[in-house]
Design a protein with these regions (language model features):
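Cleavable N-terminal export/targeting peptides
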Residues: 1-30, 249
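Short glycine/proline- and aromatic-enriched beta-strand/turn motifs that initiate or cap beta-hairpins
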Residues: 22-93, 177, 190, 243-249
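Residues on the lipid-exposed face of transmembrane beta-strands in outer-membrane beta-barrel proteins
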Residues: 35-37, 74-80, 120-124, 137-139, ...
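Extracellular/periplasm-exposed beta-strand and loop segments of Gram-negative cell-envelope proteins
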Residues: 43-69, 89-116, 143-165, 193, ...
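Repeated loop/turn-to-beta-strand initiation elements of outer-membrane beta-barrel proteins
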Residues: 82-85, 130-133, 180-184, 212-215
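Surface-exposed extracellular loop regions of Gram-negative outer-membrane beta-barrel proteins
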Residues: 169-187
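Transmembrane beta-strand segments that form the barrel wall of outer-membrane beta-barrel proteins
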Residues: 182-196, 221-222
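Predominantly the C-terminal beta-signal and adjacent terminal strand-loop region
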Residues: 201-249
Length: 249
């Protein structure tokens, strides 16, 4: 039974995960801006269901890439003194099918799914030139559209639905600069509201090839449990992220 899912998405909250030494004290009094396009090579596991039809999901990175029809993601950040505001946005669309057995009959199950995740956050930073701790609060907006089409010799059914909800989140991001051109970031958040629960965690390592750019690699987990009114989306995404941060000067 071929499994389907959603891929290369949420990022919800990579928020310039490898930005350069942002733990430094800002003495200029000016806003500093960064943007980070990135690619999340994620796997997906859990359950997706629309109406009476549900599918277990257990996808590796290669499976998700095969199913991905379109995806785009990126983040932006602004800092002034000890204050920070940031936003992360992800859109992905997947489609796949598989052969299944229905009480002695052979049929097919096709799923098309699109997802948008947008997460604005704001917070306060404490630290010095070597380390920094961001205390963050924000929102995670989800918009999901799923269509499950079951085809078999004697009957066919198609179930589709779209849901949107907002979760409140709180978390932290710890940044450490052990040497001048490298930085380590560890972060986590959790919350809920529109869904039963959501959480994410990631760690990243970045290097600065110039004063304008940081290149980074990270590993990220993002989970959500939404189960309301015959719409089920209980999944965990995890995988490597590759990104490049540009600093405006």
């Amino acid at each position: 039974m071929r499994r389907v899912a959603l891929a290369a998405t949420t990022a919800a909250m990579m928020f310039t995960y490898t930005t350069r030494a942002l733990s430094q004290a800002d003495t200029t009094g000016q806003w500093r801006y960064t943007i980070t396009p990135y690619a999340w090579l994620t796997g997906l596991s859990g359950q997706v269901g629309v109406g009476p039809v549900a599918s277990n999901i257990d996808l590796g990175v290669s499976d998700v890439l095969d199913m991905l029809k379109f995806g785009i993601m990126g983040s932006a950040e602004a800092r002034k003194h000890s204050w920070v505001i940031a936003a992360d946005a992800i859109y992905a669309k997947l489609g796949a099918g598989r052969t299944v057995a229905f009480q002695g009959e052979t049929g097919s199950l096709d799923l098309t799914q699109s997802e948008t995740i947008i997460q604005p956050v704001g917070g306060y930073t404490i630290g010095n030139n070597v380390w920094g701790l961001d205390l963050l609060g924000g929102l995670r907006y989800w918009n999901l559209t799923a269509s499950l089409d079951v085809e078999r010799p004697r009957a066919s059914n198609e179930h589709s639905d779209s849901r949107s909800w907002v979760d409140a989140t709180g978390g932290f991001r710890f940044r450490w600069v052990p040497v001048t051109l490298a930085r380590l970031v560890l972060a986590a958040d959790g919350g809920g509201g529109g869904s039963q629960s959501t959480w994410q965690a990631y760690g990243s390592l970045g290097v600065d090839p110039s004063s304008y750019w940081t290149l980074g690699v990270a590993y990220r987990w993002l989970a959500v449990d939404y189960n309301r009114d015959n719409f089920l989306y209980d999944t965990t995404m995890k995988g490597f992220i590759f990104g490049a941060t540009y600093r405006f000067k």
